[in-house]
């Protein structure tokens, strides 16, 4: 589930107040076609570009395909996968896609069924670097050959990174007043953001997410502010039917805090 949060800070020194309102616009996503021969191992992964659609064929002789892409700047990525409807009666898994992968699996894995003409992963925030995609044809495809297409979509936006699941690995949220985008993949997924205040002042935050119509009026997110020891200072929940939830404006001493 994709969400975004913005934190506003007002520092108070004597009678003066200053508010950080820096903003940044996302770049437009461009889509085009590309051609590449898949690699058969992690070490021989084929290089692909971002925001580019690639096509390949899975067969008995080419069951596993490896690709890699490089991000020169941190941002949000999402893998999109498509193929023709391959059955009128069964939706058995036809491909397994490991996104942000290594030899042992992926940060995100998606199964695409015979009738699933389109699949996509959650959006994931990543630092600059090189990352891998593994596409594996499952048993139902080994009797013949089948085509698929995919792309890795990139957005240049201020976002979380998917290693921020504890205080020790928290993302450093330096742009107070600017919206940061993240995603929650399960009920056990937790994202941490580090906030540093140089002076005593006030803090407030706003959480936005899409409505979840199947579970109206139940809590879907919990947002807490805690100190460096993990002690909770303030907690707010957001329901499935609320697209935007705002915290109260509360005072904090100078120091380091975590959202």
Predicted features by range, described:
Residues 81-88, 204-214:
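Short amphipathic, basic-aromatic surface patches that mediate peripheral association
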Residues 17, 22-24, 38, 42-45, ...:
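N-terminal compositionally biased, intrinsically disordered segments and leader/signal-like regions
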Residues 2, 10-15, 20-48, 67, ...:
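C-terminal edge strands of extracellular/lumenal beta-sandwich accessory domains
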Residues 50-76, 119-122, 132, 178-202, ...:
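Non-catalytic, beta-strand-enriched accessory regions in extracellular/secretory proteins
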Residues 86-118, 152, 183, 213-243:
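Surface-exposed beta-strand/loop patches in noncatalytic accessory domains
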Residues 73, 77, 89-93, 142-144, ...:
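Short loop/turn segments at connectors of secondary-structure elements within structured domains
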């Amino acid at each position: 589930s994709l969400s975004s949060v913005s934190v506003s800070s007002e520092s108070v020194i004597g009678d003066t107040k200053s508010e950080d309102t820096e903003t940044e616009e996302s770049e437009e996503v461009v889509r085009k076609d590309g051609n590449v021969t898949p690699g058969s191992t992690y070490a021989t992964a084929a290089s692909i570009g971002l925001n580019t659609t690639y096509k390949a064929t899975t067969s008995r002789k080419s069951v596993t395909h490896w690709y890699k892409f490089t991000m020169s700047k941190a941002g949000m990525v999402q893998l999109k996968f498509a193929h023709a409807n391959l059955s009128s009666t069964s939706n058995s898994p036809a491909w397994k896609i490991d996104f942000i992968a290594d030899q042992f699996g992926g940060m995100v894995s998606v199964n695409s069924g015979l009738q699933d003409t389109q699949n996509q992963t959650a959006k994931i925030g990543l630092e600059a670097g090189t990352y891998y995609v593994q596409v594996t044809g499952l048993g139902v495809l080994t009797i013949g050959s089948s085509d698929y297409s995919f792309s890795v979509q990139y957005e240049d936006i201020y976002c979380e990174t998917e290693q921020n699941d504890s205080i020790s690995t928290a993302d450093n949220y330096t742009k107070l007043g600017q919206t940061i985008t993240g995603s929650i993949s399960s009920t056990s997924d937790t994202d941490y953001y580090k906030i540093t205040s140089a002076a005593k002042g006030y803090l407030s935050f706003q959480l936005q997410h899409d409505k979840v119509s199947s579970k109206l009026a139940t809590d879907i997110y919990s947002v807490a502010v805690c100190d460096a020891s993990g002690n909770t200072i303030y907690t707010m929940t957001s329901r499935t039917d609320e697209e935007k939830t705002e915290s109260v404006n509360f005072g904090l001493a100078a120091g380091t805090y975590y959202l």
